Each structure stands twice: as structure tokens, then as C-alpha cells.
From Swiss-Prot:
Gene3D superfamilies: 3.30.310.210, 3.30.70.330, K Homology domain, type 1 (3.30.1370.10). RNA-binding factor that may recruit target transcripts to cytoplasmic protein-RNA complexes (mRNPs). This transcript 'caging' into mRNPs allows mRNA transport and transient storage. It also modulates the rate and location at which target transcripts encounter the translational apparatus and shields them from endonuclease attacks or microRNA-mediated degradation. Preferentially binds to N6-methyladenosine (m6A)-containing mRNAs and increases their stability. Binds to the 3'-UTR of CD44 mRNA and stabilizes it, hence promotes cell adhesion and invadopodia formation. GO terms for cellular component: cytoplasmic stress granule; cytosol; nucleus; P-body. The keyword Transport applies. This is Insulin-like growth factor 2 mRNA-binding protein 3. Expressed in oocytes, spermatogonia and spermatocytes (at protein level). It comes from Mus musculus (Mouse). GO terms for molecular function: mRNA 3'-UTR binding; mRNA 5'-UTR binding; N6-methyladenosine-containing RNA reader activity.
Length: 579
């Protein structure tokens, strides 16, 4: 994305004028200006300079009395689903941005772009062309906390490949016909084994040695290891460390990583750099808990097997746009390389499990797009849930469009209440808007109560979003051990006459439900129904477990209601005959 479109130009504007403007702004170009009537094109050295030109010149610089418009040059065939949103308030809460974006469609990914500006920039991918167009129309020029958002298309090469022209469609071989529609759920990770890149942090002073003269060294590594390697040297100007992204097979990735380590150690000897040079791997926070393992067992085993010392940056260092943790490995080049293989093996396993889980949950909890809820890392290339014939893949659970508002009582640690509410109630208000649910925290039952009840009222999708964010907040704020999963207790009320259906004959239904969801489900015996003739069902478990259990119980209740309605209809005709 280093090609720029320069619009709103005067008819008198020429290449020399544009060269002068870019020179004054200290923005280099990689070729001549191609000037047409009223607009022009130019190439920048890289994406970073292109973005800097957009931020410095678009709407801010006049040429012959007309303000220039500068944006990425995107061919019409690639103006599909991807947008770049600039000038985002720097301290904006994720919930606010998320709730704004989802108003216009399903957001498949939202990634921050590193810039030198104070405001934030994100690249957003919507699930359809129409949704992206609507978001562009509505958000470009939108005022958000006294900042004016600027939105433009960026190239969507993936969509262009997935939607070939009619001429190309007819040339596919017989084996390719319909392959994208007929892919089995288990084939996703096998088709794309390289979707998860290795991300490294290296000291800035070694970047030159890694790249080599005119890029010779990095080209050589790329060729030998069959890898794609991006050194993000233009990002975070002045930072002590730069990130490197390596995309290849697991073997190619590890080989490239080892080569980079060897180059850094050799360069350190040449410049008499005395400090230890550890291997630093960036990993999305979603994977870190499973890498550590229960009581740190997985990490300890990797340390013992590879003779290295491994530490992981604390949760407190995570920010809105940086969900990555830094895994620091200390040892020799050989031992660090072995540790990288083991660490990435574990992370890839977690990634593949998340894909499988996402496909499973998408069918267990129909109507939800899990990509849109920010549950998986946007940089991981997470594919959408596989589709197929409803009769073979989708269980006959009630669709959300037909569901009524539900009330769930979620019990959270009393100490976490302040974090859930936020300063002056800001967090809980934003969460309520984002989820589309009513969220209230009930008074403590006693002064020394260890848990507090959160009352969440809304349709199933709102419940999913609200409960998911509450689970996440409790984890982020360290109200449970970093090595543990968050497990909360949720209460839902069911009509007393339906409690037996939830339990099943001899407890069969509730046992199957616990096996399916991995949640603990209890219908306390000898309950006295409340004034609405309802009793409580208690569900305890991690987030997904609780969600699956809640949905299954709601399905049972729907079946009970439908059965009652059918009985009422069947009893109607005899009554009319007696009249």
C-alpha cells in the first residue's frame, strides 16, 4: 500500500509543484509523479512513508488555492471490504470503537497500524462489500471525542482473488469447482499451515546487519528458508527495539529465526556489544495461558528440555491496540532456537484448537460471528466458520432472531466490581452500549461478601458479548491467577414445570449437558418457586462452557413452550364442538 492517489488538484498543478510539496514535507518518493487532469499518482518507498504522507498532507496542504486530498491508491476491483480509519482519539476505549464499527456490519478484523502521529490508525475488514461501503459513507468525517475520523479504502487483494472475473471463473479445473464451498470443517488448518507468523523483537542497532547491504542478507535468508520476512524498521521511530515478522512453514520459520539470531550474535562480537542478546518472541495474549500451562508446567518443561531461561511480560503491559506479550528466552543460539521451536509448536496447537473451537461454537451457538467479537487475534488470519448444509452441520437450536430477552445473574469477585464499573461508571456504560444489554450490579448481600451479582438483561447475542467482556476484564485485571482460567457462576431462572426437562430422567439430560459444555450445571433440589413460579439453574465454568450451557437450556425451554402451545391448539377444537 505504498502507492498514493492525490486528488482535488488544480488544472495548473504539475509534477514540479508536487515534488516541491513533498520535499517541503520531507516525504521521499520512489518514482516520478504521474499527473492527470485534477489528480495524480506517486509511489512512496514503503507503506510507512505513504501513511505519513496521507497524515501530513491530506486536507492540510493547499496547492494553487485548493486543499489536496491524499489517500491510498486502490483499484476499483480491490475496493471491497477493507478500510483504513485514521485520526482516532489516542485514548479511546476499545468498547467505544468496537461498538461504533459493528453498527455497519460484521467486523472480521481490526488491526492497529503503527504511526508517528498522536492519533491512532486501524485497518478494518468487514464481511461484505456493502457493509464496508456503508461504514465508509457514515464514518468518514464522523466526529468522535472532538476528533474527525478519516476513512478510505485500502487494497483488498484477498477478496479480489476470491471473486475472480467472469473470464477467470470459467478456466478453473474440474477439481477446483466449488472447492471453497465444500471444504470440511477439519480442513481449515490443513489448507493454511502457515497462517500464524513468528513475530520477533530485535534491538534496533542490529536491524542494519539483519537487512544487510542493499537488503542482501535478508534476501539470502528469505531464499534459503523459503520465508517471507518483514522488518518493521520504519515503525516506532526512536524505539530501542524493532519487530520482525516471519511467515513460512514451521521448519522455514525456525530456520529463519536461527539465522537472525546468528547474525545478531556475530554483529555483537564485531561491535564489542557486551550485553546478553536474548530471543524475544511476540505472542498474542490469547495463547499465552496455554503456553504457560497449569502451574507453569508447560513452560518449565520447555526450559528443562532446551536448557534456557524463559520469562513472559506481565498482563499490565497490554494496551488497547497491542494485545501481544513478550516471551524472552535466554541461552545460546542453539538452545534459543530449540526453545523457539517448542514455544511456537505450543502456540500453533492453541491456534488450531481455537479455529476448531470457533467452528464448533459457531454451530453450538448459531447466529454469532465470533470473529466480530474480538475473541481471536486479528493478525492470526483466522478463517470464518466453515459453512455447509444445515442438516449436517447446524444443530436444530433456536435462531437468535426468534429469541426473547433473557436475564442472567453472573456472580463476580467482589474485589472486581470497581474495575467492571470503571471511573464514574464509564466502563459499565460503554460495555452496556457495546453489548446492547442492560447491566446492573446488585448491592452486596453482606459487608464481607466475597462475590457480587451482575444482572444482565438482553437477547442471547447481547448476553454473549456482555458476559464475554466481563470474563475478559476479570482476567485482565488479575483477579484470578495468570495460570488459571476465569470460572464464574451464572444463574438463570426457568419455569418450575420445566425444571424436570432440564434435569431429565435420572439426571440424563443434565449429565449430557455437562458433558457437552464442560460446565457444571446444578438444579438445586427442594427449591421453593418464586412469585413468578420460577426456580434457579446454576451454571459454573469458563466463558464458552457457560455460554453453551445457557443456550442449550434456553433450547429446552423453547421446546417446552412449543409443546405447550401445540397442546393448547389441539385442545381448541373439542371445546368449540361442546358449544
Amino acid at each position: 500500500m505504498n502507492k498514493l492517489y492525490i486528488g482535488n488538484l488544480s488544472d495548473h498543478a504539475g509534477p514540479a509543484d508536487l515534488e516541491s510539496v513533498f520535499k517541503d514535507a520531507k516525504i521521499p518518493v520512489a518514482g516520478p509523479f504521474l499527473v492527470k487532469t485534477g489528480y495524480a499518482f506517486v509511489d512512496c518507498p514503503d507503506e510507512g512513508w505513504a501513511l505519513k504522507a496521507i497524515e501530513a498532507l491530506s486536507g492540510k496542504m493547499e496547492l494553487h488555492g485548493k486543499p489536496m486530498e491524499v489517500e491510498h491508491s486502490v483499484p476499483k476491483r480491490q475496493r471491497i471490504r477493507k478500510l483504513q480509519i485514521r485520526n482516532i482519539p489516542p485514548h479511546l476505549q476499545w468498547e467505544v470503537l468496537d461498538s461504533l464499527l459493528v453498527q455497519y456490519g460484521v467486523v472480521e478484523s481490526c488491526e492497529q497500524v503503527n504511526t508517528d502521529s498522536e492519533t491512532a490508525v486501524v485497518n478494518v475488514t468487514y464481511s461484505s462489500k456493502d457493509q464496508a461501503r456503508q461504514a465508509l459513507d457514515k464514518l468518514n468525517g464522523f466526529q468522535l471525542e472532538n476528533f474527525t475520523l478519516k476513512v478510505a479504502y485500502i487494497p483488498d487483494e484477498t477478496a479480489a482473488q476470491q471473486n475472480p472475473s467472469p473470464q477467470l471463473r470459467g478456466r478453473r479445473g474440474p477439481g477446483q469447482r466449488g472447492s471453497s464451498r465444500q471444504a470440511s470443517p477439519g480442513s481449515v488448518s490443513k489448507q493454511k499451515p502457515c497462517d500464524l507468523p513468528l513475530r520477533l523483537l530485535v534491538p534496533t542497532q542490529f536491524v542494519g546487519a539483519i537487512i544487510g547491504k542493499e537488503g542482501a542478507t535478508i534476501r539470502n535468508i528469505t531464499k534459503q528458508t523459503q520465508s517471507k520476512i518483514d522488518v518493521h524498521r520504519k515503525e516506532n521511530t526512536g524505539a530501542a527495539e524493532k519487530s520482525i515478522t516471519i511467515l513460512s512453514t514451521p521448519e522455514g520459520t525456525s530456520a529463519a529465526c536461527k539465522s537472525i539470531l546468528e547474525i545478531m550474535h556475530k554483529e555483537a562480537q564485531d561491535i564489542k556489544f557486551t550485553e546478553e542478546i536474548p530471543l524475544k518472541i511476540l505472542a498474542h495474549n490469547n495463547f499465552v495461558g496455554r503456553l504457560i500451562g497449569k502451574e507453569g508446567r508447560n513452560l518449565k518443561k520447555i526450559e528443562q528440555d532446551t536448557d534456557t531461561k524463559i520469562t513472559i511480560s506481565p498482563l499490565q503491559e497490554l494496551t488497547l491496540y497491542n494485545p501481544e506479550r513478550t516471551i524472552t528466552v535466554k541461552g545460546s543460539v542453539e538452545t534459543c532456537a530449540k526453545a523457539e521451536e517448542e514455544i511456537m509448536k505450543k502456540i500453533r496447537e492453541s491456534y488450531e484448537n481455537d479455529i476448531a473451537s470457533m467452528n464448533l461454537q459457531a454451530h453450538l451457538i448459531p447466529g454469532l460471528n465470533l470473529n466480530a467479537l474480538g475473541l481471536f487475534p486479528p493478525t492470526s488470519g483466522m478463517p470464518p466458520p466453515t459453512s455447509g448444509p444445515p442438516s449436517t452441520l447446524t444443530p436444530p437450536y433456536p435462531q437468535f432472531e426468534q429469541s426473547e430477552t433473557e436475564t442472567v445473574h453472573l456472580f463476580i469477585p467482589a474485589l472486581s466490581v470497581g474495575a467492571i464499573i470503571g471511573k464514574q461508571g464509564q466502563h459499565i456504560k460503554q460495555l452496556s452500549r457495546f453489548a446492547g444489554a442492560s447491566i446492573k450490579i446488585a448491592p452486596a448481600e453482606a459487608p464481607d461478601a466475597k462475590v457480587r451479582m451482575v444482572i444482565i438483561t438482553g437477547p442471547p447475542e447481547a448476553q454473549f458479548k456482555a458476559q464475554g467482556r466481563i470474563y475478559g476484564k476479570i482476567k485482565e485485571e488479575n483477579f484470578v491467577s495468570p495460570k488459571e482460567e476465569v470460572k464464574l457462576e451464572a444463574h438463570i431462572r426457568v419455569p418450575s414445570f420445566a425444571a424436570g426437562r432440564v434435569i431429565g430422567k435420572g439426571g440424563k439430560t443434565v449429565n449430557e449437558l455437562q458433558s457437552l459444555s464442560s460446565a457444571e450445571v446444578v438444579v438445586p433440589r427442594d427449591q421453593t418457586p418464586d412469585e413468578n413460579d420460577q426456580v434457579v439453574v446454576k451454571i459454573t465454568g469458563h466463558f464458552y462452557a457457560c455460554q453453551v450451557a445457557q443456550r442449550k437450556i434456553q433450547e429446552i425451554l423453547t421446546q417446552v413452550k412449543q409443546h405447550q402451545q401445540q397442546k393448547a391448539l389441539q385442545s381448541g377444537p373439542p371445546q368449540s364442538r361442546r358449544k
